[in-house]
């Protein structure tokens, strides 16, 4: 649509000397693609993960409902008085700014590459003036534009709440830029990439095709309380493969490494009303980038090698939940840091929130956090995806995580914040609190909490086994507390020497019990078929099913797996052979 088509709507709005733009570019950068690591490895196991697909749960989830919502907001809009400041209250929260922007999204979308909410920027520095940031390809003086090409200096929303409009120049590449291949070399980076004896936030994790950064140690809130870690969806998931395994530091096809586990649940996009709890835009096709994946640690992974301490930062506090109704300065302008496997420890500033852009197909996308590196330094490099974005300590409190990185230098452009410096790199992140809620996870921030979480996982598994055996035999089965340590391996899935409590089971009953136990799973999620490492020693192999059919009078031995595993077929080396589990 031409700018002149909207002249009637804009003619009565105040003009800003900074509100100049190039209307030839009407699309914003799409999500960056991660360059894969070459791999010739094939997979012989099956696994399936639970993926959260974008859905809407508000009462008005259809296009008509969204239109009615904004139509009702229109009723609360006070009459405009061109050239004068509004008499209503100035916006002071993220919610205020997001509501004003959504209300005027049609105008803003027509003449910009994208928008965000935050404070006005002057000479590269943030002020304390609430504003909607409008990204344009080129800023020129309003003298060289016709009135229809100028954005208003102030926008007013429902109830008379108003804010400034700040135009920020965005150097648009038009296509994803070549991702920088440089890597910072330091003792910290060396440790994160495998030279340390521990693994934790910032450590390198890799699939067969990609590598990235471990974000946080987490646990499931429900079900069997699995302990694992969080990283990006695009780091951990490749739907061209039947399984989604993760290793540290490298997968077996590229070098030495330990099998960490396989993706149990993941999400990539969520509708705006589910993510924010409000309609963030008038476009019915509106989605938020929720790039996250949960990988529970494998059953035979040594949990003692996991640490909750963030290298280069230390102990961290609880997640900083971003409340849309909190004051802007609780987030915008705050100093942050991150620790990633490529660039190590870097610092930056939160410049904006809820970045909005539309692609060429007419779909509206949001990404939560926009960070610019300190002193015009890059905040992240390729491979840092998944890193925690951490608020630096303030007033003696511990640093608190607020997000995870999902994109950075591979974005399609850079921000020009000052006229005397060139464009700067920017990094986009996912709101950590909202991501954990969607994946039903809790972050683990102390080693003591980690041990407690592992114990809870063990108890949950014992309870599941006890319930399954009791339902099968019709007789309650109790497990003595002193036997718990004998039951579990590092994360506890192999069960040994369960007392019979004088239950006389026939061969048929034993077979039914074994079938019941083997298929124990939480029906809300698809079971994971790769709980164990691809290769295990014979001493760890489960006992055969015949032992269940012919139990001794002293004990009943059984094996529990979270989902059936397909037979494995491995290459045999000359001069050696492996007995494989069936």
From Swiss-Prot:
Effect of changing residue 475 to A: reported as: Reduced grain yield
Q: Output the Gene Ontology cellular-component terms.
A: cytoplasm; nucleoplasm
Query: Which tissues is this chain's protein expressed in?
Result: Expressed in leaf sheaths, leaf blades, culms and panicles. Preferentially expressed in vascular tissues in leaves and culms.
Description of the deletion phenotype: Narrow leaf phenotype. Reduced leaf blade width and plant height. Altered internode elongation pattern. Altered vascular patterns in leaves and culms.
Q: Where is this motif: Nuclear localization signal?
A: 567-573
Composition bias type Low complexity, residue spans = 573-582
Q: What is its main location?
A: nucleus
Q: What does this protein do?
A: Involved in the regulation of lateral leaf growth. May be involved in the regulation of basipetal polar auxin transport (PAT) and vascular patterning in leaves. Controls photosynthesis rate by regulating carboxylation efficiency and consequently photosynthesis rate. Controls panicle and spikelet numbers, and grain yield.
Name this polypeptide is given: Protein NARROW LEAF 1
Q: Which organism is it from?
A: Oryza sativa subsp. japonica
